[in-house]
């Protein structure tokens, strides 16, 4: 039981990391979509591009890790979720692929029409991907995933709770991105873009808070136990999420943005962990599937804990170095955005394309392959134990 709970906590931690890092990337695409025409949206899009370019692919490491843990540690629940929510999952995967392709190829083409087309693919995929991810989480939280799912279910992810959580995911991504971009604009000394993204952070923060409250109220019918736990044992985390959100909005209104990145990330993390604490020990609410009775053999769970420790030791410092270099603007290929820019640019296209920045990195692929291989080894070990 302890091993299963530990692995469940690790799974939630990786989901949290993907949410606060990868979610901000999706939010950048959302603001790219809403930036306006060529001239009006030129400066915001350039800042978004310069902020995302060095780190946009690396954040998916956490998604791969989360999927490997879920598949290896809790195969029954994994199979049910992947079967019942197959359509939104495939749409989310397709969105990730199209988003990456649009982001990379818009740097490689020279025609204005193609730049606009790839920019639109990047922007719309950034909107749809978190939405469909949210509907899957909503299907789980609302108890719409059966324990023995044998076919895809449209009703599982199109109910009001799932749709609300889908919109909540989009709002949270936009909120995180706007808050992070305020700091990026400040680092470049661009006061106009600071004000620009401050307004958007305030709007996205208010919308996300309203959606969170609406979701909490909506859970009364489909998942009363989850709602009860959110207002019970998980209440401190719910309060923390609300307080951090209100503090960020207050600091933005006062023109004192120092520390808002940490507060915004903490608020989103509190929401994720509040859900996890409220749902514990159920993996699939409404069924008998729990962390303890649906987990892999003990040896497999221990192997996953060791794997996570290795990931922290090997990948953690690398991510720290990556973000440190990015924070000091040492990964930029040019001078960066230091003043409001003008001129013509394709929708969603950077003003100064940097071809090398858009290329997929080898490191992320190596890490992903390694994690999948480790998961396969753990599964093989588990099967060997059963055969003996």
Show which residues each predicted segment covers.
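Membrane-interface transmembrane-helix boundary segments in multi-pass integral membrane proteins
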Residues: 226-236, 294-312
